[in-house]
Amino acid sequence: MSKNSVIIVAAGKGKRMNSSISKQFLQIKNKPILYYTLSKFSAHESIDEIVLVTLEDKIEVCSDIIDKYNINKVSKIVPGGKERQDSVYNGLKAVSKDCEVVLIHDAARPFVTSDIIENGIRCANQYGAAACGVIPKDTIKIKNEKEFAIDTPNREDLFIVQTPQCFNYNIILDCHEKLKKHNKKVTDDTMVLENYGKSVYLYEGSYSNIKITTPEDLILGEQILEKLT
């Protein structure tokens, strides 16, 4: 029977947080951010396994969190690579061979909802590739190299991409292998497919599905958690 797998990418060092502790291990309400992220996917009935990708020297820390909070769907913890795309590729190689749909998610994005997960799986099955996100609330400007505004895109045409990003496993693995062969650099997994002419369906995420990257995000995260509990 085919599986739905999720790769949680927790290999970042979080330089923008100005902390010696990686952002996924910082705490909100006395629990690490990674706990909230893992527990959301572990509790979801459509998720069969979790592959956690982290820094090699943080594997034991992650294992302790998994054991402490009894997160039972983590099948493997694997070391990350030099860049995010290398970490994702390591995760793709580690998922079960009968995986059909794989979701790729930021460890520092702990407020993903059950609906976002379910819709991602559905859209990946239907379209082959999908990513959640939101329309920007602010007006966006395009600037030139001299810092002057040169254009104002229609907000309705813009989309702030979040995670999970969800794919047919064979499609995303094939594109990542091509990317590695051609030595191309990307900032997220939708770009991996776009590099090879594949379309990515965009579906509704949530303004609360934030990535905790800065100290200000940590404060906002506490407020979001207050509303959710």
Swiss-Prot record:
Record's function text: Catalyzes the formation of 4-diphosphocytidyl-2-C-methyl-D-erythritol from CTP and 2-C-methyl-D-erythritol 4-phosphate (MEP).
Name of the gene: ispD
Catalytic activity as recorded in UniProt: 2-C-methyl-D-erythritol 4-phosphate + CTP + H(+) = 4-CDP-2-C-methyl-D-erythritol + diphosphate
CDD domains listed in its UniProt record: CDP-ME_synthetase (cd02516)
Keywords on record: Isoprene biosynthesis, Nucleotidyltransferase, Transferase
Enzyme Commission identifier(s): 2.7.7.60
HAMAP family: IspD
GO biological process annotation, one example: isopentenyl diphosphate biosynthetic process, methylerythritol 4-phosphate pathway
Record family assignment: Belongs to the IspD/TarI cytidylyltransferase family. IspD subfamily.
Organism the protein comes from: Clostridium botulinum (strain Langeland / NCTC 10281 / Type F)
Gene3D superfamilies from the UniProt entry: Spore Coat Polysaccharide Biosynthesis Protein SpsA, Chain A (3.90.550.10)
Name this protein carries in UniProt: 2-C-methyl-D-erythritol 4-phosphate cytidylyltransferase
Keyword Cell membrane: no
